[in-house]
Amino acid sequence: MIENIRIRNLRSIHDSGIIEFKPIMILLGANSSGKSTFLRSFPLFTQSVDKKLRGPISWFDSAYVDFGDYKTAKNRYADEKEGISFEYTYSDLVSIDRRRFYVRHGNYVYSTELKEGSFSFELKGDSKGTFISKISIHTVNVSFGLSVNDRNDNINFVINGISFKSPEKLFFNYNTAFGILPSIASNKSSNSDNDVSGYSLIYNRLIGILISVPLKSGPVKY
């Protein structure tokens, strides 16, 4: 369940602050304070996942909302280096498909590790359109960040505050199909069993953190 949301640099919203979701919500504010922008941000994502895109966001859809493009959607007072960002805090995440979290060698990942945390991403624009420049994921024991300065840059990985160096180039693939987040692609072409890929190193590092702190809730084996 999503507990709260924070929006930065979308139209008239420079920084919404943390907005907690309630069963009944009343938005109060002066004209052009961001009330309609906040409400329209939800169908913005609906129209973006309803179609195949060459990027993360569909800024315009005749059936939903029209934000124009990245340039017109960005807050005019935002710094040039800043992007449009969305941050969500979640709890009681019970819809995890456990089959997707297979851990090699019989290691265990504790259910509490994945059950609550926060997630955020930042959008930026260039001559080709809109792209995701930053993704951050925080769980009980893991802080995981991925970022690029340009859509074609190597991904910068930071795990619990420590930069991670991949042995090969890993970059975002923005050709999403009915989704918003990019996939991670590699320029690695060798299939040798002796090669250690960046995927494996990241995977092993994250799993090592997740299984290192036993919790009272007991382990879940994937």
Describe the predicted segments one by one:
Residues 1-222:
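P-loop NTPase switch/coupling surface
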